[in-house]
């Protein structure tokens, strides 16, 4: 029987970007937007705070966009500092690339295994689904979900008792399945 695990964000990830005031490279999203108007053109930034010194930095969301080109719902969400919009924009790879930033997902995700009653079977088939594109090592997920050490998961992988259609040695952010034979 195929069991299903879900990797879900537990909170907003930290933003990796160098602080201009201190040597820290971690910022947390404040959840606030700065909307600035130049006649009919808008600039929009997502404000982030340095975790070390508290300095505010801006991540560019929109630059010199005509007000009429924006959907009114988006403008309302920006003015209301919508937390869901903050999460959406932080997952946008184009915005991150434009701002030369990356995300640090350490401690910002959780694994929902649906219970541990399936772990005592001889053969376990599991489908892992990602609710958001969180780059994680499958070995770490399997170790956490099965209650094993990562070294033990690596050993099972080397012995051929842990098999998958995808490579389990790098980072993944997409759905995959695996079979564990004990």
Where are these regions (language model features)?
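A broad, low-specificity signal for short, low-complexity segments enriched in glycine/proline
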Residues: 7-14, 20-21, 122-125, 136-143
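Sterically constrained small-residue positions within well-ordered secondary structures
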Residues: 10, 41, 117-119, 169-171
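A generic structural signal for beta-strand entry/edge sites
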Residues: 43-45, 123-125, 175
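Extended interfacial segments that mediate partner engagement and assembly in macromolecular machines
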Residues: 63-130, 134-135
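A cross-kingdom feature marking charged/low-complexity
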Residues: 116-117, 179-182
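A basic, amphipathic helix-loop patch mediating RNA/tRNA/ribosome contacts
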Residues: 130-178
């Amino acid at each position: 029987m195929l069991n299903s695990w879900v990797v879900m964000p537990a909170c907003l990830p930290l933003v990796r970007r160098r602080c201009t005031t201190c040597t820290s490279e971690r910022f947390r999203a404040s959840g606030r937007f700065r909307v600035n108007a130049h006649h009919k053109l808008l600039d929009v930034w997502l404000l982030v705070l340095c975790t070390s010194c508290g300095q505010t930095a801006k991540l560019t969301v929109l630059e010199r966009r005509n007000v009429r080109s924006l959907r009114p719902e988006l403008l309302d969400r920006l003015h209301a500092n919508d937390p869901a919009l903050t999460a959406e924009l932080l997952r946008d790879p184009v915005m991150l690339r434009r701002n030369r930033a990356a995300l640090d997902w350490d401690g910002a995700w959780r694994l929902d295994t649906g219970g541990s009653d399936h772990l005592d079977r001889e053969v376990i088939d599991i489908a892992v689904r990602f609710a958001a594109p969180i780059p994680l090592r499958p070995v770490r997920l399997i170790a956490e979900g099965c209650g094993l050490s990562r070294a033990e998961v690596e050993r099972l992988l080397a012995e051929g008792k842990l098999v998958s259609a995808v490579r389990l040695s790098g980072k993944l952010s997409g759905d995959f399945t695996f079979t564990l034979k004990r």
